[in-house]
A protein has these predicted regions:
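Intrinsically disordered, low-complexity linker/terminal regions across diverse proteins
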Residues: 38, 236, 242, 274-275, ...
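Hydrophobic/aromatic-rich, well-ordered segments within soluble, folded domains that form packed cores
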Residues: 49-70, 202-220, 588-590
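Noncatalytic, helix-rich "gating/capping" subdomain that lines the substrate-entry/channel surface
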Residues: 100-392
Length: 675
């Protein structure tokens, strides 16, 4: 063990501190100073030192991460900080903010796309004009509600606002969704759009509802809404309560959103007459199919529109339509609202001032900003080495699948075909039309509230276009500079953007086994979703189809149950984290096999591989948020994603000379390999 620790420390000493030369080369000094606005000091490349006081065979996560965790203080704007992901996110935030300010000052190219971004940012940071804009928005909304005198008028307004050019509030959220039969066809997905507190637990708690009503009364008093503020607040809370009680538990909701119920047009119009969906459907293709993740919630909403007092519906409209436009124009209420959220939710402290403006504008226009800066941040980046890693991991998976012993021949062929034919979206969009831009919109540099409506209207216009034509499978619906990767079962496509191709995930100057441990494991994880408990419901074309026999499914479920039981024992929800846990295991195993084909590689290289893998999960969490995370997130904690997976990798025990009885050593017969 002493020799192993010595070799690892030697590797630590030669690890490069600076980022690779290609990264951020053209923006000298961009990251030279700490991100003072967010109270973080971010090194150009974070070093991870081992904790030699920890036995790696008992807790490899602490062995790899402890030294880094001990020297880090979680900022108040974060509830969790993953060193790889959040270092990248913070650096990207700084770069995007600098670009925003440069465009505003005329120091960067002001294309029509960037001009709209700059104007919206200006409208946000100009505090006096923004305050006036917010007050004018309140006046317009109050005047509109004064004109509504009947329930039918209110229902008609809410119906007309669904995916409309007005950008005004509606009770229904409509968006395009993949067809179960053909991924290039879009279905219409409908859900509620105003449940603020969470789900049935929150809407069953009298104390939570009382506090919510108290702050809403403050809102109605602040904007000068007609009627008693307390009554209006109680009315809104009651509407939300009736609909919110139909909200499924978080994991159930996630499953329903993945496989939403399909309903007929006739059912939607007959069962939900007060939503007046014919207004929306008249603007869409007549053969469009409708999906509802939670149809019982839509029925509850329809009943509310029929039974709630007109003044209650008006109050709901005012609150939902104006809640994002009452910060600077109504500072006293804004302060009370911020305090209410801090007391009620476990969310970290929100940014303020220019940082909040930058955060909001970036969220709306990330693709526009990324398109302007990607070549500057990554000059000369080579796609070919990344493609090679993807193909080697893919080849390792296909090879293993074709040798699978428990699947029937037809299912084995389909599993391999899914991986072989998965479409790759790597690094960045290859054509301009594949970027996910908002339609260029006339925005004002001085009217923030109107801009919000115009942006929402532009999103609606874009959604109607997607619903009315064939889906472009080459479109990037995520931002290329985000630290992320994903797999879409409906398209059988894998997305690996530029933003994640940085240390500790990827560095072309690192030994290749280090890159396989980082980005290779991520590639295997995402491709593993193609054949996990959810992705396996779709075939290689993206159609919803059972391609495993019932006997196959029984064996598959038995293997998965072993992972469920394993994570249940450590305090996680094994069933609801199964898809992510199985993808973690798949990713680790196949990344290792791609890095060391035919058992090649030295023990030192293999130890470095496992260290680099663990670094991807090093994180600091606010203890107050752990319980909520475990009850709602489909992922496991970083420590579990490291230690629980390594138990199933015999090569790990060999590399670190672990012995029977060590906590991370399982008997060979107890090690799990699904694929």
């Amino acid at each position: 063990m002493a020799r192993i620790l010595s070799s690892l420390k030697a590797r630590e000493r030669v690890t490069r501190i600076v980022a690779p030369a290609y990264l951020f080369a053209a923006v000298a000094g961009l990251f030279a100073s700490p991100a003072s606005a967010r109270d973080l000091e971010i090194p150009e490349r974070r070093q991870f030192h081992i904790d030699s006081s920890v036995n790696p065979c008992d807790d490899f996560y602490k062995f790899a991460c402890n030294a880094t965790i001990k020297g880090f203080s979680l900022p108040e704007t974060k509830s969790v900080y993953n060193f790889g992901a959040d270092d990248a996110k913070e650096k990207l935030f700084i770069a995007r903010t600098k670009l925003l300010e440069a465009v505003v000052r005329g120091q960067a190219t002001r294309t029509p796309r960037m001009a709209q971004v700059a104007r919206h940012y200006q409208s946000c940071v100009d505090t006096d004009r923004r305050a006036q804009s917010e007050r004018e928005a309140v006046k317009r909304a109050l005047a509109l509600m004064a004109k509504i005198t009947t329930r039918e008028q209110m229902q008609a307004l809410l119906a007309a606002n669904i995916l409309s050019g007005s950008g005004d509030f509606s009770v229904v959220h409509a968006e395009s969704s993949y067809s179960f039969e053909n991924p290039i066809i879009s279905d219409l997905s409908l859900s509620t759009d105003f449940i603020a507190l969470g789900g049935r637990d929150e809407y069953s708690d009298k104390g939570t509802l009382s506090n919510y009503a108290f702050i809403l009364a403050k809102f109605f008093k602040a904007i000068g809404a007609p009627g008693a503020p307390e009554t209006l607040a109680d009315d809104v809370v009651e509407i939300e309560r009736r609909v919110g009680l139909k909200e499924p538990e978080s994991f159930d909701l996630q499953k329903r959103q993945m496989l939403p119920k399909e309903v007929s047009r006739e059912w939607a119009l007959k069962a939900l007459p007060n939503l007046k969906l014919q207004t929306l459907l008249a603007r869409l293709p007549s053969n469009i199919k409708i999906k509802m993740p939670v149809p019982e919630q839509m029925k509850a909403l329809d009943t509310v529109l029929k039974e709630a007092p007109l003044e209650a519906l008006k109050a709901l409209y005012l609150y939902q339509h104006l809640k994002d436009s009452v910060s600077l124009g109504y500072p006293s209420f804004a302060a009370e609202w911020a305090q209410y959220k801090a007391n009620t939710f476990s969310d970290p402290k929100e940014p303020t001032g220019k940082e909040k403006c930058a955060t909001d504008v970036i969220e709306l226009f990330a693709s526009e900003l990324d398109a302007e800066m990607i070549d500057t941040l990554y000059p000369g980046f080579r796609r070919e080495p990344v493609t090679e890693i993807v193909e080697r991991v893919r080849a390792a998976m296909v090879k293993s699948l074709k040798r699978n012993k428990w699947l029937s021949p037809s299912a084995r062929d389909e599993a391999a075909r899914k991986i072989e034919t998965a479409r790759l979206q790597l690094v960045r969009p290859e054509e301009e039309r594949h970027w996910d831009y908002l339609p260029v919109t006339e925005l004002s540099a001085s009217d923030y509230a109107r801009n919000l409506r115009a942006i929402k209207a532009a999103k609606s216009k874009k959604a109607v276009g997607e619903l009315s034509g064939a889906r472009d499978l080459s479109k990037w619906y995520s931002n290329p500079l985000e630290f992320n990767a994903s797999y879409s079962p409906q398209e059988n496509s894998f997305f690996l953007p530029q933003g994640i191709l940085i240390p500790p995930m990827y560095d072309p100057a690192d030994p290749e086994w280090m890159n396989y441990a980082g980005i290779g494991a991520t590639i295997g994880h995402e491709l593993g979703h193609a054949i996990d408990v959810n992705g396996s419901k779709y075939d290689h074309t993206g159609r919803l189809r059972q391609w495993m026999s019932n006997a196959d499914l029984a064996k598959f479920n038995a293997l998965n149950q072993r992972l469920v039981d394993q994570f249940d024992k450590i305090g996680h929800d094994g069933k609801n984290t199964l898809a992510e846990n199985s993808a973690d295991l798949t990713g680790l195993l196949f990344a290792y096999e791609a890095a060391f084909p035919n058992s090649s590689g030295t023990p030192k290289q293999k130890r470095e591989f496992f260290l680099q893998y663990a670094r991807g999960w090093c994180e600091v969490r606010d203890p107050k948020g752990v319980k909520e995370f475990l009850s709602s997130d489909p992922h496991s904690l970083g420590q579990a994603r490291t230690n629980e997976m390594l138990k199933h990798v015999g090569a790990f025990a060999e590399a670190f000379k672990c012995k029977a009885g060590d906590k991370l050593v399982l008997p060979e017969k107890s090690r799990l390999r699904i694929w």
